[in-house]
């Protein structure tokens, strides 16, 4: 349980600092990956929605 609490604190601390982990820029060598990196946080939401579509396809058995 303390591990989950500390992880939440770290995430909140990083999110509150604009120059923190979540808002860091990629190095120039990886600049071509910017569109992919911008889209990556949405991927888990798509899997969540896919689960509902799948269940609707099998009539929510």
Swiss-Prot record:
Signal peptide (residue range): none
Keyword Endoplasmic reticulum: no
GO biological processes: photosynthesis
Coiled-coil region: none
Keywords noted in UniProt: Chloroplast, Membrane, Photosynthesis, Photosystem II, Plastid, Reaction center, Thylakoid, Transmembrane, Transmembrane helix
Pfam families reported in the protein's UniProt record: PsbK
Gene Ontology CC annotation, any one: photosystem II reaction center
TM annotation in the entry: 36-56
The keyword Acyltransferase belongs to this UniProt entry's keyword annotation: no
Family: Belongs to the PsbK family.
Subunit structure: PSII is composed of 1 copy each of membrane proteins PsbA, PsbB, PsbC, PsbD, PsbE, PsbF, PsbH, PsbI, PsbJ, PsbK, PsbL, PsbM, PsbT, PsbX, PsbY, PsbZ, Psb30/Ycf12, at least 3 peripheral proteins of the oxygen-evolving complex and a large number of cofactors. It forms dimeric complexes.
Function in brief: One of the components of the core complex of photosystem II (PSII). PSII is a light-driven water:plastoquinone oxidoreductase that uses light energy to abstract electrons from H(2)O, generating O(2) and a proton gradient subsequently used for ATP formation. It consists of a core antenna complex that captures photons, and an electron transfer chain that converts photonic excitation into a charge separation.
Protein's name according to its UniProt entry: Photosystem II reaction center protein K
Biological source species: Nymphaea alba
Taxonomic classification: Eukaryota, Viridiplantae, Streptophyta, Embryophyta, Tracheophyta
